[in-house]
A protein has these predicted regions:
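Intrinsically disordered, low-complexity serine/threonine- and proline-rich regulatory segments
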Residues: 2-12
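Catalytic core of pol beta-like nucleotidyltransferases
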Residues: 12-113, 117-128, 137-328
Length: 328
């Protein structure tokens, strides 16, 4: 009786997590390889592929299997469409690796780390997808970084390519504090899947300190960080920006923050008039942080809350999606 109850509980946990993962993938017209799905299950759900497939097939979810992936619904994208999204993501990643150091030369030292998140980090991109960035600045550098980045992008970024969106920029103390608290399964996956462009050691150290991420997705955590050596840098105690630059950062803050809020209001007004409610977003501007959070991503977070092992503390967000790009 006890073994049966335990097995039923594990089935329920597995199914709840799988439903959330597949539902989120469906939001982006995508699916999941069963092996990748296994890597996203919590501890205690030790499934092999045949057991997982059997559980999914008797779950009642409308599922389709195509190209080695499982999809929600009866009309999965064709193999050609899947390959096209994967190829576009690789092209965008190659472009970002080439262009970011060139365009932001002289700006990157303001940061502790810079990573790509969103669809590109997951290896699939559509024609309309932006490139989402998550940046952690040195103390006193958030608004200076944003200002210099927007200027550099306007002047130096002359080659065609996907839109760059610096959707979350946090001062390092804010990032350390935020990543130390449980943010739920969806955020754990987003944070782990981020692809580092600058300050990789720093970012790895942050993740190694975030034990809640390991508890939430142990297999993926081990796959991403299990062989990583102890980083040579600490996520705390780094030198702040020199005081003249901190003063400039403070002077820029009220003007650039106001500008971004106005841009956000204008964009949202246009989205409402055009019947594009899913593209609405919030603009969060504080002295030590700036975030854009889309309504679509808020819904994804809510979808994933029931799949979290540790109840999330989502008073603030690690990152946003698809905010405005003032450099365009």
């Amino acid at each position: 009786m006890g073994e049966s109850t335990s097995s039923d509980r594990m089935d329920a946990i597995t199914l709840r997590r799988a439903e959330a993962i597949l539902g989120i993938a469906n939001e982006f017209q995508s699916g999941m390889a069963p092996r990748d799905l296994l890597d996203l299950l919590p501890d205690g759900t030790l499934w092999d592929l045949s057991k997982l497939r059997h559980l999914l097939e008797r779950s009642g979810m409308p599922l389709s299997w195509a190209g080695g992936r499982v999809f929600v619904g009866e009309n999965p994208p064709s193999a050609h469409q899947q390959d096209h999204r994967t190829l576009r993501a690789q092209e965008n990643w190659d472009s970002v690796q080439r262009e970011v150091p060139r365009v932001l030369d002289g700006v990157l030292p303001v940061l502790r780390s810079l990573s790509v998140t969103g669809s590109l980090a997951f290896g699939e991109s559509s024609e309309k997808d932006d490139v989402d960035f998550f940046a952690i600045s040195r103390r006193g550098g958030v608004w200076l970084f944003l200002f210099l980045t927007y200027v550099a992008a306007r002047i130096r970024r002359t080659r065609p390519g996907p839109v760059w969106c610096f959707n979350t920029v946090l001062e390092e103390e804010v990032a350390v504090r935020e990543l130390s608290k449980p943010l739920g399964f969806v955020m754990a996956r987003e944070i782990l899947m981020a692809r580092s462009l600058w300050g990789t050691d720093y970012y790895v150290h942050l993740l190694q300190r975030a034990d809640w991420i390991r508890r939430e997705i142990p297999r993926l955590y081990e796959a991403r960080l299990g062989s990583a050596p102890p980083p040579s840098v600490s996520p705390t105690g780094a030198a702040a920006m020199p005081w003249p630059l901190r003063a400039l950062n403070a002077a820029i803050f009220p003007f650039l923050a106001t500008y971004l809020q106005l841009v956000g209001l204008l964009r949202n007004w246009r989205f409402r008039r055009g019947g594009r409610a899913s593209e609405l977003f919030r603009t969060h501007t504080r002295y030590r942080e700036m975030r854009f959070t889309s309504s679509k991503f808020e819904q994804i977070l809510q979808r994933g809350e029931g799949a979290s092992v540790i109840p999330p503390q989502l008073g603030s967000r690690h990152r946003g999606e698809s905010g405005p790009d003032p450099s365009r």
